[in-house]
């Protein structure tokens, strides 16, 4: 395939156009008075959302050079969402400001590498300063505050705080679409482990990039499966039952994997394969935990089981299984409660008897998974469109709340970034282009506050000036238009979210500023229509207009 190229200033400006296109679509959602964005879907109703990363993922530009810029900023939003679960719009706004100011300086003759070093140094300093000013989140009321701010709904905030209290801070909280108008919390027996699907072809929910198996059979084995002949007898029995199947094995590869993938793609059978978590003896113990929770028999040669000779009796069951690229969640396993209680008691004894700190930590993790259960929040709404939007908000709020519990909170509403500017006084002792890099970060840090104010109908620059002059933690409540003590008003952001937004924006901006050439595939030109021969008006060659 032929490639086309673009160089230096021309390349960077086309990247900037792409950055602006995506950022302008996303930043209107910032703050409590942010607007919604409607996303067209090929199938079903359109999606209405104010979630930055959801909007960013939908954007593809026709100009291939500009599209590269849009994809780079999409990476900022996605990365921030993956690490902190929120703050995607803030990260996008910061990236846009850093790119704009950076390119202006590059055009004026600044060295991009020097600017990048200055931007990185300033971002690191801001991150350290924010961490130092963070306040721990420990009680239920504080957790509810953080969740309420993220979800912009006090009912959701209370539900998340309740869920965290019941399953523990490290517990699993999942979100499902509800069947009533009310949003409800349900704590069920369940388990989650950090291994995702072996192949993305097992995905059943393209939007969420998840494999969702309802009322599923579960095969748990210590073996590596590579020959389909080993699995075939069992697969045929499961197929007769018309139920989905989750396979947890040391690995599934070769002919076995390709056969499962083909069946999943053809929709002959709903199936998903995941690798077993852990290593060695610990892996075997974790598989035994799963077997007890799901009512399965652990299929292992040393226990007298051969994979090609077992039937449905060795399979466990679960009401629901959700597998994404990183995690597998099993909800409502079909095991006996008494067996699970015995297993929990056994692990507690092992913890007491263990001398190794590491062993105790890993045993405690297994205990939490076995005894904590899974909190399921069912998003209720009057219409499917509203339900999907609410589900998005709840998922964001859960991630933000977990981030707050992990590292603490700072004042929200964009105030923390605007009031952390004194940390950059003296330009960190840097000179030349590195000093300019620090001043670029200084200008960018006010942008989230400016857009929160602007979206709420205020003059952004006037608000920035007022907030920057106030004591730490005092700022604009954009919902009411008043200047308040943000912590007392419950307007807080997880410091992990804010730090990651700054770090990821600085990273992508630095890469973009130091870009000197772009290489993209040459767009295919439309083929000309077949030559037509008209009569009465002479001959017409080529496409007619």
From Swiss-Prot:
Protein name: Chaperonin GroEL 2
Encoding gene per record: groEL2
Taxonomic lineage from the root: Bacteria, Bacillati, Actinomycetota, Actinomycetes, Micromonosporales
GO cellular component: cytoplasm
Record keywords: ATP-binding, Chaperone, Cytoplasm, Isomerase, Nucleotide-binding
Catalytic activity field: ATP + H2O + a folded polypeptide = ADP + phosphate + an unfolded polypeptide
Compositional bias annotation for Basic residues: 534-545
Primary localization: cytoplasm
Alphabetical GO biological process terms: protein refolding
EC number: 5.6.1.7
PANTHER family in the record: 60 KDA HEAT SHOCK PROTEIN, MITOCHONDRIAL (PTHR45633)
Molecular function GO terms recorded: ATP binding; ATP-dependent protein folding chaperone; isomerase activity; unfolded protein binding
SUPFAM superfamilies: GroEL apical domain-like (SSF52029), GroEL equatorial domain-like (SSF48592), GroEL-intermediate domain like (SSF54849)
Main function: Together with its co-chaperonin GroES, plays an essential role in assisting protein folding. The GroEL-GroES system forms a nano-cage that allows encapsulation of the non-native substrate proteins and provides a physical environment optimized to promote and accelerate protein folding.
